[in-house]
Amino acid sequence: MANPNFTPSWPLYKDADGVYVSALPIKAIKYANDGSANAEFDGPYADQYMSAQTVAVFKPEVGGYLFRSQYGELLYMSKTAFEANYTSASGSVANAETADKLSTARTITLTGAVTGSASFDGSANVTIETTSGS
């Protein structure tokens, strides 16, 4: 049974430098008397609260994108600006694309019916050549 309280993560986008952000295009904006607002999105995504300061600084519009930067900040860009700078990365982001190389390589060793070892630093896959053990 699906969890009725589950809200999926926002889709990922990547810029030309390989920096990832999560973003959604705004479907509707509901303003409050204090200058804050709630952005609504298509699909199963929860509304996003925008403070009065965020609304005053970015002046978000329907169709533009709310996004979380790589630092976790909530930011806004117009549709034209966002789509000129970012491309969809959802479904294509592998851990290897975003992982750092290990500062110290690790040795993976097999013992028992077969033996072998390989050094792994996270920069590429490894293959272990095996020989019959004891």
UniProtKB/Swiss-Prot annotation:
Any Gene Ontology CC annotation: viral capsid, decoration
Keywords: Capsid decoration protein, Capsid protein, Late protein, Virion
Localization (cell): Virion
Function summary: May cover virion head capsid and play a role in capsid stabilization.
Record-given protein name: Decoration protein
